[in-house]
């Protein structure tokens, strides 16, 4: 009888250990898909620090974001961004 209880406890423990990584994976995917995490502001600088004043004025108004799923309206793809091993689109307006 004691052996049966011990074996049952071991089987239940094994099932619980296998179930925990699945729950953690679900929680990780939920946190990865948070809105707002898609868009990350980026500071962009181009060219020579002694560039023309016309170029400086046009770049001052340039706002860029690293986006996972493509650019929004009024934005255009201006390259790629890298955060760790992931690549994002650099979208500027």
Curated annotation (Swiss-Prot):
PROSITE patterns tied to this protein: DEFENSIN
Function of the protein: Probably contributes to the antimicrobial barrier function of the small bowel mucosa.
Any Pfam family the entry gives: Defensin_propep
Tissue: Paneth cells of the small bowel.
Localization in the cell: Secreted
SMART domains: Defensin_propep (SM01418), DEFSN (SM00048)
Family recorded in the similarity comment: Belongs to the alpha-defensin family.
Keyword line: Antibiotic, Antimicrobial, Defensin, Disulfide bond, Secreted, Signal
PANTHER family, per the entry: ALPHA-DEFENSIN 1 (PTHR11876), ALPHA-DEFENSIN 1-RELATED (PTHR11876:SF2)
UniProt name for this protein: Alpha-defensin 15
Disulphide linkage map: 64-92, 66-81, 71-91
GO term, biological process aspect, one: defense response to bacterium
InterPro entries for this protein: Alpha-defensin, Alpha-defensin_C, Alpha-defensin_N, Beta/alpha-defensin_C
Region listing for Disordered, in residue ranges: 23-56
Entry annotated with the keyword Translocase: no
Propeptide: 20-58
Top-level taxon of the source organism: Eukaryota
GO cellular component: extracellular space
Signal peptide bounds: 1-19
